[in-house]
């Protein structure tokens, strides 16, 4: 059996007397796309931050290709081959889309290859026509796609996305879903998301968080029809 790409073992996080995440065991296979869902305060965002190095766990481990990255910081995790896109785009508003992607691609490519990678990425994210526009002038959805292009241009093995569809129009959500599915042909992804329409567009397997722990995990149709999941989203305490 192939070793998992990413794994957590008894991962927990406390903030003072509050147990935000409790003993989470999670496994992601090579090339898998996994969605993390749950109501506000369920623990999924804290779990995500431990995967990305924004928080160090109180106990337990995060393993990437078998290596313990539990105490690594975000910049160290990025160098290992994990691309991270948070809710707030981390782009340079005063630079063009092309310049933003060029800076990221230049970290791992050199010479003429950088320009080729940038052109390929602009086409991939559908922003060739906006390549020379300042990122600060882009619509919300375009800014999100620009940051996806930045993350992709560093050629990570695993991409972590935090609510990529937040604040988007229906058309932007549809295009983002298409882009995520296309990315998943060659990359593994973990996506934290609230938009159920978007989840149905992209997900095969879903992990549901409730009260800091994994409530249920399985195929998207099975999970979203599970009465425990419905109860959690309606505000009832899960059995």
Spans of features found by a protein language model:
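Glycine-rich phosphate-binding loops of nucleotide-dependent enzymes
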Residues: 2-239
């Amino acid at each position: 059996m192939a070793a998992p790409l990413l794994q957590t073992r008894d991962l927990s996080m406390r903030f003072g007397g509050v147990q935000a995440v409790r003993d989470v065991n999670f496994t992601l296979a090579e090339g898998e796309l996994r969605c993390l869902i749950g109501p506000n305060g369920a623990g999924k965002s804290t779990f995500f931050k431990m995967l990305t190095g924004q928080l160090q766990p109180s106990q337990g481990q995060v393993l990437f290709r078998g290596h313990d990255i539990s105490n690594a910081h975000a910049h160290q995790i990025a160098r290992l081959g994990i691309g991270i896109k948070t809710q707030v785009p981390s782009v340079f508003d005063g630079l063009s889309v092309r310049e933003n992607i060029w800076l990221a691609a230049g970290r791992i490519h050199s010479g003429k290859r950088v320009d080729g990678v940038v052109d390929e990425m602009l086409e991939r994210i559908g922003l060739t026509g906006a390549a020379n526009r300042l990122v600060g002038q882009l619509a919300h959805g375009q800014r999100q796609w620009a940051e996806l292009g930045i993350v992709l241009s560093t050629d990570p093995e695993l991409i972590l996305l935090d609510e990529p569809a937040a604040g988007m129009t229906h058309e932007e959500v549809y295009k983002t879903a298409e882009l995520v599915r296309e990315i998943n042909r060659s990359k593994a992804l973990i996506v934290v998301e609230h938009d159920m329409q978007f989840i149905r567009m992209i997900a095969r397997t879903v992990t549901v968080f409730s009260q800091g722990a994994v409530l249920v995990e399985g195929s998207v149709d099975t999970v979203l029809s599970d009465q425990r999941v419905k109860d959690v989203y309606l505000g009832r305490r899960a059995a």
